[in-house]
């Protein structure tokens, strides 16, 4: 009986010794990956919170509180809207013949001439803005039968009655007659011409006849492809700058070789020339109250300038220049490192070193993947640069491709409509909101997809490194199941280095490894069986010990050495 107990205890001790790897004294080499104490959470396709070693923020949320005049050329409209500058309102003369990449309109700009409206305000504003200049070409028009150069007290220039400098107010001649007018201008140039003209709407019938003689005027403007005919709307309106009449501003584009014809029997506000329209520029207009500074930035918003190489921004949906795309999310983290598994306080079972299956290694600063070994010369840690570089190349390539996909010039201007176009404005806003919603969703999905692939790639590189080492060692070592190998031959630091760099020759150590295996344990046990044997041997020891005690008690009772008395 005592012999059986001793056998069980010996078996238990043998299993314990093999698990701790401390009694055999064999060298151990473990494969691991970098870990940090506090990782970064990213989203993947399957999980909203995956902790990785490192990640890059893709959404820019910072901006400067000023507009940078370089490399984009800015023109400050100050008190003038762009259309006021094109019409030649008093106070806007400084804008004549200016050029720009971005025309800055101020919310404080005001009209300073006869009250007017533009039925197609947004289109005219867009055409003028995209042309990049107010290059005006004066032309000689012959307006027979009328008086030219009309003026108004609502349009003071230098303290005197004046009018829009780019328009000519035609009224009845000194003989009391008005026209009729029939004037043709041919575009003999090589560029598109923009003509601005208008129709005056008097406040009363008396004003109508005083200015134009006829009770009902009419203006017709024609090109080969278009014709518009306007009859004035006579009637009183709320006074603006002491005027109850209004002027409606219209515009006509005339292509090279085409002609424009003006016909009128009254109420025509005639052009004095045309604007040269260039379709090759990508200029625009921006409404902002931010001052123009002396900084440099390729991206402007209504809230200031953005200086960032990130593919997305959450500063403003109104962005001009080489800008990140606007998304609704305040943060999109792109994984640039592997899954983070912080190291435990005790490395491995009973304090032994452990590999990547059990935990990551903090302090592996010169690489993502590496080796940790323990042999007769001590312990050491070294990075595996090849697998690290392979993972870094894939992730950097992924990051560059993502930036390329979203690095195209993003250009979103603020649309402005007249009140009568409210439904169009609502539709435009709905379309823009829908586009932003779709792009924001696509951006989040794209980043989640890339994160999923990044984590899969880094896990794959770890497995590739493990398989490479396993194929090198073959039967010379045993896989312990936690990312470590127990080597069954003497392996100094040079030997360890050969395993790391892939020059290890298992044939050199094969015989020594086989002999050591036989000495340590004739039967090779896997890590799972070692655990089972440990518990079985422990249980057998306990069972035999209890059986021995019971047997002794029964033997003593039979011989009268022990007497049991039960009291009730």
UniProtKB/Swiss-Prot annotation:
Ranges of the Cytoplasmic topological domain: 553-568
Oxidoreductase found in the keyword field: no
Entries under SUPFAM superfamilies matching the protein: Influenza hemagglutinin (stalk), Viral protein domain
Signal peptide interval: 1-17
Gene Ontology, cellular component aspect: host cell plasma membrane; membrane; viral envelope; virion membrane
Location of the protein in the cell: Virion membrane; Host apical cell membrane
GO biological process assignments: clathrin-dependent endocytosis of virus by host cell; fusion of virus membrane with host endosome membrane; fusion of virus membrane with host plasma membrane; viral budding from plasma membrane; virion attachment to host cell
Main subcellular localisation: virion
Coiled-coil portions: none
Paired cysteines (S-S): 30-484, 68-295, 80-92, 113-155, 299-323, 491-495
One example GO MF annotation: host cell surface receptor binding
Residues in compartment: Extracellular: 18-531
Keywords: Clathrin- and caveolin-independent endocytosis of virus by host, Clathrin-mediated endocytosis of virus by host, Disulfide bond, Fusion of virus membrane with host endosomal membrane, Fusion of virus membrane with host membrane, Glycoprotein, Hemagglutinin, Host cell membrane, Host membrane, Host-virus interaction, Lipoprotein, Membrane, Palmitate, Signal, Transmembrane, Transmembrane helix, Viral attachment to host cell, Viral envelope protein, Viral penetration into host cytoplasm, Virion, Virus endocytosis by host, Virus entry into host cell
Transmembrane segments: 532-552
Topology in membrane: Single-pass type I membrane protein
Post-translational modification: Palmitoylated.
Chain positions carrying an annotated carbohydrate: 21, 38, 62, 182, 242, 314, 501
S-palmitoyl cysteine-type lipidated residues: 557, 564, 567
Role of this protein: Binds to sialic acid-containing receptors on the cell surface, bringing about the attachment of the virus particle to the cell. This attachment induces virion internalization of about two third of the virus particles through clathrin-dependent endocytosis and about one third through a clathrin- and caveolin-independent pathway. Plays a major role in the determination of host range restriction and virulence. Class I viral fusion protein. Binds to sialic acid-containing receptors on the cell surface, bringing about the attachment of the virus particle to the cell. This attachment induces virion internalization either through clathrin-dependent endocytosis or through clathrin- and caveolin-independent pathway. Plays a major role in the determination of host range restriction and virulence. Class I viral fusion protein. Responsible for penetration of the virus into the cell cytoplasm by mediating the fusion of the membrane of the endocytosed virus particle with the endosomal membrane.
Misc: Major glycoprotein, comprises over 80% of the envelope proteins present in virus particle. The extent of infection into host organism is determined by HA. Influenza viruses bud from the apical surface of polarized epithelial cells (e.g. bronchial epithelial cells) into lumen of lungs and are therefore usually pneumotropic. The reason is that HA is cleaved by tryptase clara which is restricted to lungs. However, HAs of H5 and H7 pantropic avian viruses subtypes can be cleaved by furin and subtilisin-type enzymes, allowing the virus to grow in other organs than lungs.
HAMAP family given in the database record: INFV_HEMA (MF_04072)
Subunit organization: Homotrimer of disulfide-linked HA1-HA2.
Family: Belongs to the influenza viruses hemagglutinin family.
Name of protein: Hemagglutinin
Species per Swiss-Prot/TrEMBL record: Influenza A virus (strain A/Mallard/Astrakhan/263/1982 H14N5)
């Amino acid at each position: 009986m005592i012999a059986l107990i001793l056998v069980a205890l010996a078996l238990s001790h043998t299993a314990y010794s093999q698990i701790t790897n401390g009694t055999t004294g064999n060298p151990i080499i473990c494969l691991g990956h970098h870990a940090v104490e506090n990782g970064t959470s990213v989203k993947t396709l399957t999980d909203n919170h995956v902790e990785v070693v490192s990640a890059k923020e893709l959404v820019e949320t910072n901006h400067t509180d000023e507009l940078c005049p370089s490399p984009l050329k800015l023109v400050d409209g100050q008190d003038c809207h762009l259309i006021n500058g094109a019409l030649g309102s008093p106070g806007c003369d400084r804008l004549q013949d200016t050029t720009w990449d971005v025309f800055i309109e101020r919310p404080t700009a005001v009209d300073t001439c006869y009250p007017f409206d533009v039925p197609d305000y947004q289109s005219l504003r867009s055409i003028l803005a995209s042309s990049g200049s107010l290059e005006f070409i004066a032309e000689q028009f012959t307006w027979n039968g009328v008086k030219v150069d009309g003026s108004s007290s609502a349009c003071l220039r230098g303290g005197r009655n004046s009018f829009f400098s780019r328009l000519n107010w035609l009224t009845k001649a000194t003989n009391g007659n008005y026209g009729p007018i029939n004037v043709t201008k041919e575009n003999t140039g090589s560029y598109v011409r923009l003509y601005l003209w208008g129709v005056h709407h008097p406040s009363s019938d008396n004003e109508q006849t005083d200015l134009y003689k006829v009770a009902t005027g009419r203006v017709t403007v024609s090109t080969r492809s278009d014709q518009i005919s306007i009859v004035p709307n006579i009637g009183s309106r709320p006074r603006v700058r002491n005027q109850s009449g209004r002027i409606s501003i219209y515009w006509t584009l005339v292509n090279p070789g085409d002609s424009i014809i003006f016909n009128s029997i009254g109420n025509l506000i005639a052009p004095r020339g045309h604007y040269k329209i260039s379709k090759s520029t990508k200029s625009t207009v921006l409404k902002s109250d931010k001052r123009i500074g002396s900084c440099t930035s390729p991206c402007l918003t209504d809230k200031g300038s953005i200086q960032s190489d990130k593919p997305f921004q959450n500063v403003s949906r109104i962005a001009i220049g080489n800008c990140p795309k606007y998304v609704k999310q305040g943060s999109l983290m792109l994984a640039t490192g592997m899954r983070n598994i912080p190291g435990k306080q005790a490395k491995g079972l009973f304090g032994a070193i452990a590999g990547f299956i059990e935990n990551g290694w903090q302090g592996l600063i010169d690489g993502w993947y590496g080796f940790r070994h323990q042999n007769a010369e001590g312990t050491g840690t070294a990075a595996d640069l090849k697998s690290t570089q392979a993972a870094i190349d894939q992730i950097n390539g992924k990051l560059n491709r993502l930036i390329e996909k979203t690095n195209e010039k993003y250009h979103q201007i603020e649309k402005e409509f007249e009140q009568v176009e409210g439904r169009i404005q609502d539709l435009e806003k709905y379309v823009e909101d829908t586009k932003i919603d779709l792009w924001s969703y696509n951006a989040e999905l794209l980043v989640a997809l890339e994160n999923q692939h990044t984590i899969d790639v880094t896990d794959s590189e770890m497995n590739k490194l493990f398989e490479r080492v396993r194929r090198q060692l073959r039967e010379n070592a045993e896989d312990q199941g936690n990312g470590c190998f127990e080597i069954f031959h003497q392996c100094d630091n040079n030997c360890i280095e050969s395993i790391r760099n892939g020059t290890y020759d298992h044939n050199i150590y094969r015989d020594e490894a086989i002999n050591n295996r036989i000495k340590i344990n004739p039967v090779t046990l896997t890590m799972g069986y070692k655990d089972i044997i440990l518990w079985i041997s422990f249980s057998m020891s306990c069972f035999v010990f209890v059986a021995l005690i019971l047997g002794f008690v029964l033997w003593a009772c039979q011989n009268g050495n022990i007497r049991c008395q039960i009291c009730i």
